[in-house]
Amino acid sequence: MSLSATQNLPNLTLLRLMNDHTGAFAEAIRGVNTPELQVADNDYAVGLVVDKVAHSPYAASTLIFVVEDDAQDGPDHIDAHRSIAFVAGPHVKQGQLVSEHYTTVSLIRTIEEILGIRPQNLHDAGVRPMIEIFDLSKTNWTYTAAPSSLLLNTQLPFELVQPNVRHADGGDSPKPLHDAAWWAAKTKGFDFTDADRNDSAVYNRILWEGTVGEKPYPAERSGLDLRQNRGALLKLEDPTRRAPTVPAPSAE
């Protein structure tokens, strides 16, 4: 069914695209069989949704909010609570920096305000909508999806979806670090029948090894405030002090 077949889209649509969870490498179809390829495939699917809306009669009256599930289920040098979000559609500022702190709840509150829905609980009731990202004078917008050139390594039928498709990064064809056989062996015994059925800590380390290589895995942050009394915390000593001399054992 085409987007405009019914001429009556619902006021709110929730859409889940889950290939960015990655997995099932031995069974993956059309060569989308490594994490890099699966994430690129998922990104392209999101782009195609936005592309379809942007070139439809609903473009002037549809806002699209995009967030990730389990955006960072694991530590690195940045707080593991961080995430990304995208907003596309009319009245969205473009090419501007907005220095506001938003959370997923901010996004939910914004959707509620736009649709005239009452807050669900105290959590979203106490959060401001994301008004700083909007400019009501900006009505024109468009978007054309462009797949990553990573996907050139697959058998995805681009021409059936987008004739004369243009790849986002110039058409070069980088290769994943490891092939499907490596990933299938590393995840043997894993359950990929649905998201989040495996030990996330174990899988995170496999993903790190397979996509980053020999770089050490990030240590999990303790959350302790180490700004005060750092010398004592690090057990620093006076560098002028010498270690005591220990006499050699007697030959007797």
Regions found by a protein language model. Give the residues of each.
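N-terminal pro-sequences and low-complexity stem/linker regions of secreted or lumenal proteins
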Residues: 1-252
